[in-house]
Amino acid sequence: DAIKSVWKLIRSPGGFARDYVLGKRSAQMHPLGLLLLMIGALVVLLGETQYLVPTLASEEAQRMFALVREYSKWSFSLGIIAIYASAMLVFRKRLGYNATEILALAVYIHAVCIALQIVNQLPLLVWRAPEVLQWHRKWSPWTMGVAQTLIVVFAFRQFFRVTRWREVWKLVLAGGLFIAAKWGVQQLYARAVVEIVHWQMGL
């Protein structure tokens, strides 16, 4: 059932979320359960590929990284905030959806984005050379950023039924707001993590 739900969600994230909020929940996996499944799979894969493990010379640097990694576990959910904010700002009054239903949409979309990250990591299970990993770390954030924005816009179009060409600007605006909100949330979270780690280490 989980595999079927993931496949249906990937094919039509907005339609999947719309069916859920309109009451067809027996055939849909709960958004939180699906999100936790995706995050768990991504964490396991990142550990296998050693994607987030840098080469650190000193013991102090290793301790600092361990603390940063511990706090960064919550960062996998930051995209939900950006998706939710952009949807509320642009489409909040459309079709009568309430805040909770739009939050469910945001969780489902974020689950698809994480599924895309999982696919993006799979080649590193085969090509493990350090130069390949370095190249992947350099370019992946850009390609994934574009792909995730397209997923968000595609899902918004389905969920909010944006079918008229004269309304396309709303999708473009929502995509731009998503990019800005995601960048802002990540910057704030990163700064908060650094400050907490510095405080714990007495720096």
PLM features per residue range, with description:
Residues 1-203:
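Membrane-proximal intrinsically disordered regions of secretory-pathway and membrane-system proteins
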